[in-house]
Amino acid sequence: MEEKVAAIIAALRERYPDALCALHYGKDYELMIAVRLSAQCTDARVNLVTPALFARYPTLDAFAEADVAEVEGYVHSCGFYKHKAEDIVLACRMLRDEYGGKVPGTMEQLLRLPGVGRKTANLLLGDIYGTPGSVVCDTHCIRICNLLGLASGKDPAKVEQQLRAILPPEESSDFCHRLVLHGRAVCAARKPACDRCCLAPYCKSFTGE
């Protein structure tokens, strides 16, 4: 398994050298907000919404004091806008009042924030702090890792645990970002382009194993 994992990591690194989060942001708390908006929504849609949102509320204080109903108007097109708007305002208020205005750097602290689950927390830890072992289990990651035989099942917490056991900690965050890029560019759920997939030699769908 160790050799297989190393080969998959190398193939993804060669294909996607820039393992960057697709969400656009300038400040750490803006990434937290963008990730919350991305739930059940495309990153592309979020990136259309956030410029106006961040311009209207240019500081953490502005978000913390924002009228939730007004925020709803800005994020409406991202879906589940009432919950998302409320979470954003409450989370920013908690950052200001309890965390010194900074996105905290531990899983325990992050999970206290409204609207922040393990997926979001792992992404923030990996992208903001470069924390080793940060495994972001989104739908692309779960689906492709099942095809590659690196994980089994669809439960994000269980897949996260399985991947953490086999991925080198320093590679885990970039690995997950690259799987998202690969899922969008090549390994689409409905119509995967197996003929141009750099992971085909390791994939159950392609090899039939």
Task: Show where each model-derived region lies.
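Catalytic cores of DNA base-excision repair glycosylases
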Residues: 2-209
